[in-house]
């Protein structure tokens, strides 16, 4: 069994239980910040990632939604190296808002991995904003339906040290698939899909928002199957990796996919420091909640915010008190 991030902190489940249900009734008016008088311009900075990934356009959409909803708030974008940089920048007071993936947020709060010896104890969540889901694709000609049937085959798990490869190894470990009984290659989506087409690979793993465009193109080019997990496998994965949550790849997400596929994912979180004014966080949370639908039209990944309880449930670290009060 490979070593997982969270063996020492099983009590993290209380974080996702801190809010037993998200707000579903009509919204109350946002409560003003006590530390920011009405009419005073507030300039905030949101940390994203490089412009080629998902975080940058997502951050841009969030910044625009907040700035347009409240003329007294301006949100500026800050490109960064991604989740780790954003967590550290929040801790150091260099940014006000930051996009941080759930696994990194948990590691930061608890001083694990890159944060060993330097935890970000004050990291808190306003809302989950989009998911990345585990997707496995294989040629239908193999005649397999489940991930565990990949044992003994040639598998592209994702680039070295990527979240795609990390999640793939967690999955394969649960399924009893190792480098001694199978061929695991650190190919990404592009080279992995090419390997499927050429016959040099049997399956590819993707860990991203769905649909993954490369998988859609591959399923257009040849009959493919989106592989499933058994309930036992999902239970094992989720019980040992508390930053993951259960989700579904809906039927017809990919060409030829005629049924829902149960899977797991990780949420990208909009984070702040514990010390951010509670009234301001309440207002920001309200803006995001009220604009969830329009945010999805700005970037498809953000449609998840419109799903019941997505924004405030199954979180790996605590909500900020202002966000918790809103929900």
Could you describe each region identified by the protein language model?
Residues 261-326:
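Segments of small-molecule ligand-sensing domains
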Residues 116-129, 134, 253-262:
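A structural signal for short loop-to-beta-strand junctions that line the ligand-binding cleft
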Residues 41-69, 73-74, 132-198, 313, ...:
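Bilobed "Venus flytrap"/periplasmic-binding protein-like clamshell domains
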Residues 41, 70-72, 82-85, 92, ...:
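Extracytoplasmic
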Residues 31, 36-107:
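N-terminal (or domain-start) structured segment
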Residues 102-104, 112-114, 142, 178-271, ...:
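Pocket-lining segment of extracytoplasmic ligand-binding domains
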Residues 49, 61, 65-72, 89, ...:
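Structured segments of extracytoplasmic/periplasmic soluble domains
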Residues 1-42:
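Short, low-complexity disordered leader/linker segments with a strong preference
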């Amino acid at each position: 069994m490979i070593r997982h991030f969270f063996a020492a902190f099983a009590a993290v489940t209380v974080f996702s239980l801190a809010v037993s249900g998200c707000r579903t009734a009509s919204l109350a008016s946002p409560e003003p910040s006590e530390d920011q008088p009405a009419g005073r311009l507030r300039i905030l900075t949101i940390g994203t990632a490089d412009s080629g990934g998902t975080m940058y356009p997502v951050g841009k959409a969030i910044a625009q939604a907040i700035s347009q909803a409240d003329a007294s708030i301006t949100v500026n974008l800050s490109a960064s190296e991604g989740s780790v940089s954003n967590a550290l920048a929040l801790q150091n007071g260099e940014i006000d808002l930051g996009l941080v993936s759930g696994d990194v947020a948990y590691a930061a709060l608890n001083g694990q991995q890159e944060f060993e010896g330097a935890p970000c104890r004050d990291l808190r969540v306003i809302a989950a904003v989009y998911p990345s889901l585990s997707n496995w694709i294989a040629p239908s000609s193999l005649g397999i339906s489940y991930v565990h049937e990949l044992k003994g085959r040639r598998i592209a798990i994702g680039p070295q040290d990527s979240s795609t490869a990390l999640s793939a190894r967690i999955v394969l470990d649960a399924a009893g698939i190792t480098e001694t009984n199978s061929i695991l290659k650190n190919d990404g989506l592009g080279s992995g899909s090419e390997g499927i087409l050429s016959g040099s690979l049997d399956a590819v793993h993707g860990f991203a928002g769905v649909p993954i465009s490369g998988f859609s193109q591959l399923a257009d080019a040849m009959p493919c199957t989106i592989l499933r997990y058994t309930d036992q496998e999902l239970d094992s994965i989720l019980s040992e990796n508390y930053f993951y949550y259960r989700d579904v790849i809906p039927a017809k997400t990919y060409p030829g996919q005629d049924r829902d596929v149960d899977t797991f994912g990780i949420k990208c979180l909009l984070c702040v420091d514990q010390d951010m004014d509670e009234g301001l966080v309440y207002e920001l949370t309200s803006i995001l909640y009220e604009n969830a639908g329009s945010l999805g039209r700005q970037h498809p990944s953000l449609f998840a915010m419109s799903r019941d309880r997505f924004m405030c449930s199954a979180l790996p670290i605590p909500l900020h008190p202002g966000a918790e009060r809103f929900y």
